Amino acid sequence: MKIERINDNTVKFFITYVDIEKRGFARDEIWYNRERGEQLFWQMMDEAHEREDISFDGPLWIQVQAFEKGLEVTVTIAKNVMDTEDDSELGSLLRSAIDEARDQQSVLDQLSELDELEAEADAWAPLAMETNDFEAIISLSKRTGDMFSDLDLKLYHYQDRYYLWIDFPDEMEPEDEENALSLLAEYLTFSTQTQPMLEEYGKLILDGDVFAKVRHYF
C-alpha cells in the first residue's frame, strides 16, 4: 500500500486488489460486507498512523475511487468542524463512499468482460502509473532487480509528474504480473493517462529496461 500525504489535512491511499487479498480480504467482501469493508479501512488508517505518524482525529471526509487494479482512498480531516462524528455517522459516510466506488467497479468489471472477448483472459492491458517525485522512481529501481527487464516500459515527464507506461508481455505468468504490480503500487499511483496523450504531450525520458537505466545513471 502506498500512502501519499497531500497536505496537513488530506491523505491518499493506493492499494491493489492483490494487496487487499494478502491482507485476508476477498475482493467482493469490501463491496458487499459492510463490516469487512470498515475493517480494511481502519487497518489502512492504523498503518498510516504507524508509518507516517498521521493522526485521524476529528470528522473525516472519505472518497473511494475504483481502478482496474486497485483502489484510491482519499481521507480529509475536517479540522474546522467543531462537532465530532460518532461511529454510526462515520460508518454511514464510509458505506456511501464504498457504495459509490462499487458502482465504479461494476462498470470496470463490465468493460473488462468485453475486453476478455477480444483478448486472452490472463493478458493484462497496458497501463500507466505516476508520481510527482522522481526519488520514488529511484527508490523503486533499487528493489526491482531483473523483475522488469523483459517488460516494455516507458518513462515520461508531463506537467511536473512522471508517468511509467507498462506493457505486460503475453507470455508473462499472471502471478508474476500481480507481484510486479504490487511492488509498483508501493511507490506509484494508478493513472488515467493514455499512451497517445503521453506520446504527444509528454517528454519521453527513458524506455526499455527503465529501472536498470535509472540505477546506472542515479
UniProtKB/Swiss-Prot annotation:
Pfam family, one: MecA
Coiled coil: none
Origin superkingdom: Bacteria
InterPro entries: MecA_C_sf (IPR038471), Neg-reg_MecA (IPR008681)
Gene Ontology MF: a single term: protein-macromolecule adaptor activity
Family: Belongs to the MecA family.
Record note on quaternary structure: Homodimer.
Record text about domains: The N-terminal domain probably binds unfolded/aggregated proteins; the C-terminal domain interacts with ClpC.
Reported function: Enables the recognition and targeting of unfolded and aggregated proteins to the ClpC protease or to other proteins involved in proteolysis.
Protein name listed in UniProt: Adapter protein MecA
Record organism: Exiguobacterium sp. (strain ATCC BAA-1283 / AT1b)
